[in-house]
């Protein structure tokens, strides 16, 4: 974030200003800071499905295919 002083005890920047406007512009949310949780979960889910798919593929070809 951009050098804002925090009033919160753990040092976080508040999500909203006192007037209700967002403290960080929407564009900055995509270019600074951690990745959104939905993006991490989607990538992780796709990776898990890929690995499980490899196991199923391996059961039909190769050593375990009878």
UniProtKB/Swiss-Prot annotation:
Residue ranges of the region described as Disordered: 1-27
Transmembrane segments: 37-57
GO BP terms in the entry: photosynthesis
Alphabetical keyword list: Membrane, Photosynthesis, Photosystem II, Reaction center, Thylakoid, Transmembrane, Transmembrane helix
Subcellular location: Cellular thylakoid membrane
Top-rank lineage group of the source organism: Bacteria
UniProt membrane topology term: Single-pass membrane protein
A single GO cellular-component term on record: plasma membrane-derived thylakoid membrane
UniProt similarity note: Belongs to the PsbJ family.
Assembly: PSII is composed of 1 copy each of membrane proteins PsbA, PsbB, PsbC, PsbD, PsbE, PsbF, PsbH, PsbI, PsbJ, PsbK, PsbL, PsbM, PsbT, PsbX, PsbY, PsbZ, Psb30/Ycf12, peripheral proteins PsbO, CyanoQ (PsbQ), PsbU, PsbV and a large number of cofactors. It forms dimeric complexes.
Job of this protein: One of the components of the core complex of photosystem II (PSII). PSII is a light-driven water:plastoquinone oxidoreductase that uses light energy to abstract electrons from H(2)O, generating O(2) and a proton gradient subsequently used for ATP formation. It consists of a core antenna complex that captures photons, and an electron transfer chain that converts photonic excitation into a charge separation.
HAMAP family tied to this protein: PSII_PsbJ
Name of the protein in its database record: Photosystem II reaction center protein J
Natural source organism: Synechococcus sp. (strain RCC307)
Lineage of the organism: Bacteria, Bacillati, Cyanobacteriota, Cyanophyceae, Synechococcales
């Amino acid at each position: 974030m951009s050098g804002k002083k925090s009033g919160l005890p753990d040092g976080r920047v508040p999500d909203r200003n006192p007037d209700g406007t967002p403290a960080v512009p929407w564009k900055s949310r995509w270019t600074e800071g951690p990745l959104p949780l939905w993006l991490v979960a989607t990538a992780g889910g796709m990776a898990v499905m890929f690995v499980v798919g490899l196991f199923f593929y391996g059961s039909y070809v190769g050593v375990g295919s009878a």
